[in-house]
Amino acid sequence: MNLRNSIAIVTGGASGLGEATVRYFVGLGARVAVLDLQEGQGAALADEFPGRVKYIRTDVCDEAQVQAAIDQTLETFGAVHVAVSCAGIVEGSKVVGKSNGVFGPHPLDLFSKVIQVNLIGTFNIMRLAAFAMQWNTPNEEGERGVIINTSSVAAFDGQIGQTAYAASKGAIASMTLPAARDLASFGIRVMAIAPGIFETPMLAGLPEEVRESLGKQVPFPSRLGRPVEFARLAASIVENPMLNGEVIRLDGAIRMAPK
């Protein structure tokens, strides 16, 4: 599918990997709806690209809000061809250990929160975007849409304290193939990207020496990943019709140590 003149929705599109994807897609001629809770950053991005980017405040876990966001995208741009899910949270806690200074079992509400945002939020976007995509006129390949979800290397190399996060990202990886099979008859592809350690707002608060140390753990290139590299891969997935039902590690060959 050619990104030029395509319509995409990007969750978590106001910052980090999502923002880079929005900017890259717009540069290739797409129009993009940014679904995010960060109103200031989302609105600023839309102001930067008038007529090309629309910001819609959206909680990806809320069925009604996501459906309303898709409806607004359809009203504004006329279709949804691509959906990229970048919205997510990172929370750490051991199965048994200290949480908020108290020794005990992993807080169940914390585990549920991570699963709700990362997994259920991603699935919510996928199912509702796919329903909108199946009405699209197919291209010459019979293709109607592309869905790209964000997993993580933690799905495969989860570290100490990452049980909830790894579970959420592992589930995203696991549902990629069956979702692709489910949607094949509609001409909709499903892929996932599993990023390694990237320069994102989540790492921005760390001291420079800590970020450099993290980058040196990557075999090659020995640095943190750049958000635009995620965006380039997302664009390549959209434009290559044979990429379907697979999880691509984007990590410089890193394999995470236990801690």
What residue spans do the PLM features occupy?
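C-terminal substrate-recognition "lid" of short-chain dehydrogenase/reductases
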Residues: 2, 226-250, 255
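The beta1-alpha1 cofactor-binding region of Rossmann-like NAD(H)/NADP(H)-dependent oxidoreductases
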Residues: 39-40, 57-69
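Catalytic Tyr-X3-Lys loop
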Residues: 89, 103-126, 147-148, 172
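Conserved mid-core segment of classical short-chain dehydrogenase/reductases
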Residues: 89-112, 131, 135-141, 161-164, ...
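Alpha-helical segment proximal to the catalytic Tyr-Lys
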Residues: 131, 180-182
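Residue(s) in the substrate-gating loop at a strand-loop-helix junction
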Residues: 152
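Short, small/polar-rich loop/turn modules that mediate ligand/substrate recognition or access, typified
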Residues: 184, 189, 243-246
